[in-house]
A protein has these predicted regions:
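Polytopic transmembrane helical bundles with strong interfacial aromatic enrichment
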Residues: 1-333
Length: 333
């Protein structure tokens, strides 16, 4: 089972890589697909009663033309739409392979596959990939984000395999507790959703810069993604959903488990410190997002700072710090 899990892991990364290439192809031919046309559809400025009935052009508008002549050409094969559908299908295949990787890993170990850094990363990226498929189902217009979601999945899963791989083994004694299921599962779910939330947050900043007339890299990447308002709203909803879960897992279940295992609720262990820092930063983001005087771009930068602290907690603490949570370098959580 352990060897099968490793093989499925390799296939998972390949599937996400193929999905990324397909998303990139749709991105390149985006104006020909329905999703691409929705992303770049020109806005029209509304005029009040008594004003001229002609539409007023705003920057980015297309000149008025005959509806028949402005319609996209009908071709036997709409390459953009085809690549997009292939990308979603391959992405879904990657999710199934990802699930198989975790299931076979758990069967081989005789426990939930959350016992070390390698398994934790695989579980977080799995939650992120499932959350992405749910978002796609509810908001198909944001499909162009798939290129960047798949890129994150490939990079993180590849890093898990190259840097954090740990052979299947039993749990360390400190993890033999029912709190293991409660604490770690909520942290995994919250982290996976926050991972996904970082993608529209980044693209919102890029799209906002593009809308302001910036035409250098990386702002040119914003040309074919959804409207900035759509991306910002998706960013907020993902973070608002994940934050209560992260609060429960990091600041309630974690301290209760610590008291049961080590006789104290909080010991300022490096991972505890960085989890608290992440919580504070994400709380600041939600507060800034709810404050009318704070620009949405400023609030979004705070959200990305929160994600940076999560990465520090995952890689930096596990690989470079010693503490109660770093049980065996990359093998610990």
């Amino acid at each position: 089972m352990a060897e099968l899990s490793n093989q499925l892991m390799a296939l998972t990364v390949l599937a996400y890589l193929a999905a990324m290439v397909s998303y990139a192809a749709e991105y390149a031919f985006g104006n020909r697909s329905r999703v691409g046309r929705a992303a770049v559809r020109p806005a029209r400025q509304l005029v009040g009663a008594g004003a001229p009935t002609d539409a007023v052009e705003v920057p980015g508008d297309l000149p008025p033309s005959d509806p028949a002549s402005s319609a996209p050409p009908r071709t036997p094969l709409d390459r953009g739409a085809l690549f997009g559908k292939v990308a979603v299908g391959v992405n879904a295949l990657g999710v199934l392979l990802h699930l198989g990787t975790l299931v076979t890993r758990g069967l081989a170990a005789g426990r939930m596959p959350w016992g070390n850094m390698y398994e934790f990363i695989l579980s977080v990226t799995f939650v992120g990939s499932v959350a992405w498929m749910v978002v796609l189902t509810r908001r198909p217009g944001v499909r162009h984000l798939g290129l960047f979601v798949a890129l994150c999945l490939v990079v993180l899963n590849g890093a898990a395999a190259l840097v954090a791989y740990t052979p299947v083994g039993p749990l360390v004694p400190a993890l033999h507790s029912y709190w293991f299921l409660i604490h770690v599962s909520t942290i995994i779910i919250a982290s996976g959703i926050l991972l996904l939330g970082a993608v529209p947050a980044t693209m919102f900043l890029i799209r906002s810069g593009y809308d302001q007339g910036k035409r250098r890299f990386p702002y040119t990447l914003g040309k074919r993604v959804s409207a900035a308002e759509t991306l910002e709203r998706l960013t907020f909803r993902l973070h608002a959903f994940a934050f209560p879960l992260f609060t429960f897992g990091a600041l309630i279940a974690g301290p209760l488990w610590a008291e049961a295992s080590w006789g104290r609720y909080w010991g300022w262990d490096p991972k505890e410190v960085w989890a608290f820092i992440s919580w504070v930063v994400y709380a600041c983001y939600l507060h800034a997002r709810a404050t009318p005087s704070v620009k949405r771009t400023t609030a979004t930068w705070i959200a990305l700072l929160g994600f940076a602290t999560m990465l520090m907690n995952l890689f930096g603490v596990n690989l470079f710090f010693t503490g109660l949570h770093s049980y065996a370098n990359a093998g610990g959580m």
